[in-house]
């Protein structure tokens, strides 16, 4: 025997109908986030698949102008956005390697970090909705179920022994259907949240790896001096001035 949803809707009380409406809104909102997020990440991945090999090749060939041009033209891909932020920060210095200092390298690293934070914030926008829907929809449905069962047994008490099981069956069905709706809303939201979270973690690895590749290129392009820590360089400079290994206070 099938379930007549229209009949159940007609038999529902105002509270149960309100619960169903709330869950319908939650479902529409979460599906909208899923579609928007899927399109956003797919476009970003496609753009990065085109950009990353070209950029890596340009870096390996030390074709700086081409690398900068690629980063500036690709604004959709997550990797291009991160590298574009770093290159935009130090582009005038990159064209003249003799002027690059450790402060410039640090500036490029900070630019990468800032752009990664912005990009990740955009990627994660909406995930909170999926997490909230996935966590609360079953409880919203359970609330409707609880109130439906209360109403069913209240009706049974009013009818007395003459009502029997038939007297409360409609109320029980009304109560349980809200739990089913809650699970139908929550399960896709939880699946989507886990999927997008994993996908964003993978994109973060791609951004981190490629940005490190750029920073390594900048360090190598100005010599091995930047392979040493700032403290080591300051210590050696002080040692050269004082002629000893101790730094005076």
Specify the residue positions occupied by each region the protein language model found.
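Hydrophobic membrane-targeting segments
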Residues: 1-55
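Alpha-helical membrane-interface segments at transmembrane helix boundaries
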Residues: 6-16, 113-134, 166-177
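Hydrophobic side chains within alpha-helical segments
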Residues: 20, 33, 40, 127-129, ...
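Alpha-helical transmembrane segments
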Residues: 24-44, 48, 142, 149, ...
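Predominantly long cytosolic amphipathic alpha-helical stalk/bundle segments
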Residues: 46-140, 147, 151-162, 191-249
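Conserved functional loop/turn residues at catalytic and ligand-binding sites
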Residues: 63, 141, 176, 180
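Hydrophobic alpha-helical transmembrane segments of polytopic membrane proteins
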Residues: 175-189
